From Swiss-Prot:
GO terms for molecular function: GTPase binding; ionotropic glutamate receptor binding; PDZ domain binding; signaling receptor binding. Residues 928-958, 1086-1099 have a biased composition (Polar residues). Keywords: Cell membrane, Cell projection, Cytoplasm, Cytoplasmic vesicle, Endoplasmic reticulum, Membrane, Phosphoprotein, Postsynaptic cell membrane, Repeat, Synapse. It is found in: Cytoplasmic vesicle; Perikaryon; Cell projection, Dendrite; Cytoplasm. InterPro entries: GRIP1/2, PDZ, PDZ_6, PDZ_sf. Its main location: cytoplasm. It is a peripheral membrane protein. Residues 869-880 have a biased composition (Low complexity). Interacts with EFNB1, EPHA7, EPHB2, EFNB3, KIF5A, KIF5C, KIF5B and the C-terminal tail of PRLHR. Forms a ternary complex with GRIA2 and CSPG4. Can form homomultimers or heteromultimers with GRIP2. Interacts with GRIA2, GRIA3, GRIPAP1/GRASP1, PPFIA1, PPFIA4, FRAS1, PLCD4, PTPRF and liprins-alpha. Interacts with ATAD1 in an ATP-dependent manner. ATAD1-catalyzed ATP hydrolysis disrupts binding to ATAD1 and to GRIA2 and leads to AMPAR complex disassembly. Interacts with SLC30A9. Interacts with BUD23. May play a role as a localized scaffold for the assembly of a multiprotein signaling complex and as mediator of the trafficking of its binding partners at specific subcellular location in neurons. Through complex formation with NSG1, GRIA2 and STX12 controls the intracellular fate of AMPAR and the endosomal sorting of the GRIA2 subunit toward recycling and membrane targeting. The modification Phosphoserine is found at residue 43. This is Glutamate receptor-interacting protein 1. It comes from the Eukaryota.
Length: 1112
């Protein structure tokens, strides 16, 4: 088809002889030019006939510049046989050679003689209206020989046209409906000078206005009304060839082109078999090389027009290619990743080269492949695949030179490929800002609201997404430029109400190679200048200005899928991959990696394909690529496997424990602390390593410093983020840099973790003197071998075990503690004496030490003692489903304490943990409850009815009353040294409504000096009183709803809607509670008017009250 179009152009140029009369046809022009579209003497068949109205304006004394033949006295209807270059008719871009003129200014020419028609056209006046009939363009079918592609072209108007003629469009008769087809490109016009558009291309949109379903007249009107610069989306045909894909050696490719026209190929050098070779680096979209289908990126160029490239430099090869004539002969060695192709048209001849290469295993086979193209005048794009015969010299094991494919599947002309949303990467439908419901919603609301990561919206195909922004710097390419086209409002001068979209990305351009930009992304700013509230023309001008400096900085907004991410275990992720475009993930091998350990995803490029899935996170373990296991592969092998993947990459991932959304399942507490330094130091020392995924730990605090005074930061805490910049995958040096650059206000995201120190970690943190006697219990407890990291000594994220905290069988935390040996089971969870870890994390633990039957250094209990305690203390099992709810419950409560300013409670919790009370695993001794320590008052998950009794709390391991050891004295001493003087407790209370009074037996009031809701009055013997509530208790949660910032107006409805059961989390100042006890009892007429509510005594039993004995 390309050869045909070029022949047309040459013939037109050769026919620039001056006619004797501007409207007469010379005898030498009786024969239509070779290759002209449907020039016939007879009428056009009705099913192929289209019509249009052409309006021309001419000055007095000038001619239209067209030659008309035919008439009633001639051999056919009046038709246009020639258009003079530069004439009015030619520059109008509305007429084409072969069009039939039906009427002039309403005068029907059916019965006019030839000389009468000429006379009418001469004397018609300044305004000429022609009714024209033309042959509809042929149907372009995407089938076995042709595939469709799209490209965006930006053209500047010349006069009021772009230098091409369009035909087709929608019609009332479906058989006459066609896409809008470009049938002629005027030589020397804007489209011809730009060089991309060729006759036969389909025009899909103009400045984002889709032309599908528009009539010819409507399409012409849109072209006229657009601005002086317009962006056109063009669909073109690409020939595809089996002979290239199945070639076993060098091929000779002949491509026809106009002399002086560029082939559209950029070359580079590469090394193959220790020799420098010339290869195709880039192919411009819609260029001659792209349309022919025989050349691909990566092909080796062996010769150009017979000149060998073996000893040529890159500059010489480029010059040879530029000097080629109308027939380019290239000898190529196809790249091994050449895409599957079909047959090509007759202007591309492919045959086997005689050149034998030392690395070519089929060099001795003499096989030639000839492609015959049969041209159909009605369907010039359609190619038939000829039958091929193969020489007998080919052995049965040799690959065939060509694979014939005659797939019956094809697409009609009006089922454009651009409508297959999600199939083609350059889909027009998905890029239109008005093509989806999502875009319409974004246009109705303030667009800036979508910048919030917390606001999810519905994207294409109904997928839930959230938006993110990133900055991209592009460096222009000499051939393709930046390689992006924008799509904005209907008119170029219209102010944009939403940012322009990226509607097209050119293949192998800087925009595609960066791996970040995708079609449909919103361009928020260009070189720092916001695009919103500006015009589309201004946005395009910014891009054009950037091409002068060959560099542009884009701020883009894109969609990230809200994927369902497994919190543990393994799963598969499939990512689409393009040639020369990275997936956006960086893999690394930890220095402590052992044989069989997986590789780790150490970085994910923002905006990349991997990032947009919303599934992958830093630290995830990469187990396999395309079902190739990586446990025995080096990092270099894995990178090579990743680079060799085609089209779709399948990754097998194991989730990193730190990426789990349910941190509470491991007892982790994560909260944020804001420090205002006011020019002074923070007073913290951090330690870590340069390994990306080693934790950054607070190793020491300056005495009386800013961090220590907050009461929320402690030695051994892990820093997750600094000023919202995550430290995930970052070394110690980067964390130090972030702290140095943090400014006056520093926000730290802290994690109190229960994880034991990894065996592979090379560093241990020093611990304060007051805890130096606390050992790990993992190895010999001698002082020399004791690890020094504080988190090894105690799990600092375990909920507080004072009288306010629920029992261990209610906390639902899977804990493994001490030396590996005896395993204790309760509530469906294992208490192992190795370390504290979640069940999700066990699979990734390094091999544990051999079991040792030794005593715990601080407790003095052997495995036998643990067993004896287990036999008596773990008899009552509880529901494990409630356990998971409990762990979420406590973590939220602790976070509430931090965010509401009660950092003293956190200090109390820390001190309780450091005191060693975390070893109290709620073992119940065989003796009476009143003699044993309990950590919680409310056992609401028991299948029996609640019981009301009173107990006191003990900081020792469950045992009989006589078991007092040196450990207890040590713990008490540590409590005196460590614990904060702030008296505060944390309680969880479950109440059942009084069936008689229909309330919970207490009233609430707003705080006077501090924001919050507090217990005011308590009815004696009511559910609140029996449940242990006291005046001045602060309500942190009501039925798992955080109420730290609520007032009574919001809390009272929550309590009223709770039904018969009410779950509360309260904080208590024991001193205030003791004062309230001394106050006289309330009068007997205490009523519901004090906002009283809570639990039924009809459930019977004894609900325990807590006697706070541990004031901090």
């Amino acid at each position: 088809m390309i050869a045909v179009s070029f022949k047309c152009r040459c013939q037109i140029l050769r026919r620039l002889t001056k006619d004797e009369s501007p409207y007469t046809k010379s005898a030498s022009q009786t024969k239509p030019p070779d290759g002209a579209l449907a020039v016939r003497r007879q009428s056009i068949p009705e099913e192929f006939k289209g019509s249009t109205v052409v309006e021309l304006m001419k000055k007095e004394g000038t001619t239209l510049g067209l030659t008309v033949s035919g008439g009633i006295d001639k051999d056919g209807k009046p038709r246009v046989s020639n258009l003079r270059q530069g004439g009015i008719a030619a520059r109008s871009d509305q007429l084409d050679v072969g069009d039939y003129i039906k009427a002039v200014n309403g005068i029907n020419l059916a019965k006019f003689r030839h000389d009468e028609i000429i006379s009418l056209l001469k004397n018609v006046g300044e305004r000429v209206v022609l009714e024209v009939e033309y042959e509809l363009p042929p149907v372009s079918i995407q089938g076995s020989s042709v595939m469709f592609r799209t490209v965006e072209v930006t053209l500047h108007k010349e006069g009021n046209t772009f230098g091409f003629v369009i035909r087709g469009g929608a019609h009332d008769d479906r058989n006459k409906s066609r896409p809008v087809v470009i049938t002629c490109v005027r030589p020397g016009g804007p489209a011809d000078r730009e060089g991309t558009i060729k006759p036969g291309d389909r025009l899909l949109s103009v400045d984002g206005i889709r032309l599908l379903g528009t009539t010819h007249a409507e399409a012409m009107s849109i072209l006229k009304q657009c601005g002086q610069e317009a962006t056109l989306l063009i669909e073109y045909d690409v020939s595809v060839m089996d002979s290239v894909a199945t070639a076993s050696g060098p091929l000779l490719v002949e491509v026809a082109k106009t002399p002086g026209a560029s082939l559209g190929v950029a070359l580079t050098t590469s090394v193959c078999c220790n020799k420098q070779v010339i290869v195709i680096d880039k192919i411009k979209s819609a260029s001659i090389a792209d349309r022919c289908g025989a050349l691909h990126v990566g092909d080796h160029i062996l010769s150009i027009d017979g000149t060998s490239m073996e000893y040529c430099t890159l500059a010489e090869a480029t010059q040879f290619l530029a000097n080629t004539t109308d027939q380019v002969k290239l000898e190529i060695l196809p790249h091994h990743q050449t895409r599957l192709a079909l047959k090509g048209p007759d202007h591309v001849k492919i045959q086997r080269s005689d050149r034998q290469l030392p690395w070519d295993p089929w060099a001795s086979s003499q096989c030639s492949v000839h492609t015959n193209h049969h041209h159909n005048p009605h369907h010039p794009d359609h190619c038939r695949v000829p039958a091929l015969g193969f020489p007998k010299a080919l052995t049965p094991n040799s690959p065939p030179a060509m694979v014939s494919s005659s797939s019956p599947t094809s697409m009609s002309a009006y089922s454009l490929s651009s409508l297959n949303m999600g199939t083609l990467p350059r889909s027009l439908y998905s890029t239109s800002p008005r093509g989806t419901m999502m875009r319409r919603r974004l246009k109705k609301k303030d667009f800036k609201s979508s910048l919030s990561l917390a606001s999810s919206t519905v994207g294409l195909a109904g997928q839930v997404v959230h938006t993110e922004t990133t900055e991209v710097v592009l460096t222009a390419d000499p051939v393709t430029g930046f390689g992006i086209q924008l799509q904005g409002s209907v008119f170029a001068t219209e102010t944009l109400s939403s940012p322009p979209l990226i509607s097209y990305i050119e293949a192998d351009s800087p925009a595609e190679r960066c791996g970040v930009l995708q079609i449909g992304d919103r361009v928020m700013a260009i070189n720092g200048i916001p695009t919103e509230d500006s015009t589309f023309e201004e946005a395009n001008q910014l891009l054009r200005d950037s091409s002068i400096t060959s560099k542009v900085t884009l701020e883009i907004e894109f969609d990230v899928a809200e994927s369902v991410i497994p919190s543990s275990g393994t799963f598969h992720v499939k990512l689409p991959k393009k040639h020369s475009v990275e997936l956006g993930i960086t893999i690394s091998s930890p220095s402590s990696r052992k044989p069989g350990d997986p590789l780790v995803i150490s970085d994910i490029k923002k905006g990349s394909v991997a990032h947009r899935t919303g599934t992958l996170e830093l630290g995830d373990k990469l187990l396999a690529i395309d079902n190739i296991r990586l446990d025995s592969c080096s990092m270099e092998d894995a990178v090579q496997i990743l680079q060799q993947c085609e089209d779709l990459v399948k990754l097998k991932i194991r989730k990193d424990e730190d990426n789990s959304d349910e941190q509470e399942s491991s007892g982790a507490i994560i909260y944020t602390v804001e420090l205002k330094r006011y020019g002074g130091p923070l007073g913290i020392t951090i330690s870590g390593t340069e390994e990306p995924f080693d934790p950054i730990i607070i190793s020491s605090l300056t005495k009386g410093g800013l961090a220590e005074r907050t009461g929320a930061i402690h030695i051994g805490d892990r820093i997750l983020a600094i000023n919202s910049s995550s430290l995930k995958g970052k070394p110690l040096s980067e964390a130090i840099h972030l702290l140095q650059m943090a400014g006056e206000t520093v926000t730290l995201k802290i994690k109190k973790q229960t994880d034991a120190q990894p065996a592979s970690s090379p560093k241990k943190l020093p611990i304060p003197s007051h805890s130096s006697d606390l050992g790990d219990g993992e190895e010999d407890p001698s002082p020399i071998q004791r690890p020094g990291k504080l988190s090894d000594v105690y799990p600092s994220t375990v909920p507080s075990v004072d009288s306010a905290v629920d029992s261990w069988d209610g906390s639902g935390i899977d804990a493994r503690y001490g030396s590996q040996g005896t395993t204790f089971q309760t509530s469906g969870y294992n208490f192992n004496t190795y370390d504290w870890r979640s069940p999700k994390k066990r699979a990734s633990l390094s091999p544990v030490p051999k079991p040792r039957s030794q005593t715990y250094p601080d407790v003095g209990l052997s495995n036998e003692d643990w067993d004896r305690s287990t036999a008596s203390g773990f008899a009552g099992a509880s529901d494990s489903a409630d356990a998971e709810q409990e762990e979420n419950f406590w973590s939220q409560a602790l976070e509430d304490l931090e965010t509401c300013g009660q950092s003293g409670i956190l200090r109390e919790l820390e001190a309780t943990i450091m005191s060693g009370s975390t070893m109290s695993l709620n073992h119940e001794a065989p003796t009476a409850r009143s003699q044993l320590g309990r950590q919680a008052s409310f056992q609401e998950r028991s299948n029996s009815r609640p019981h009301y009794s009173q107990t006191t709390r003990s900081n020792t391991l469950p045992s009989d009353v006589g078991r007092k050891s040196v450990t207890l004295r040590k713990m008490k001493q540590e409590i005196k040294e460590i614990m904060s003087p702030t008296p505060v407790e944390l309680h969880k209370v479950t109440l059942y409504k009084d069936s008689g009074m229909e309330d919970f037996g207490f009233s609430v009031a707003d705080g006077l000096l501090e924001k919050g809701v507090y217990v005011k009055n308590i009815r004696p013997a009511g559910p609140g009183d029996l449940g242990g509530l006291k005046p001045y208790d602060r309500l942190l949660q009501v039925n798992h709803v955080r109420t730290r910032d609520f007032d009574c107006c919001l809390v009272v409805p929550l309590i009223a809607e709770s039904g018969n059961k009410l779950d509360l989390v309260i904080s208590r100042n024991p001193l205030a509670s003791q004062k309230s006890i001394e106050q006289p009892a309330l009068p007997s007429d205490w009523s519901e008017q004090n906002s009283a509510f809570f639990q039924q005594p009809s459930h019977g039993g004894n609900l325990e009250t807590r006697e706070p004995t541990n004031t901090l």
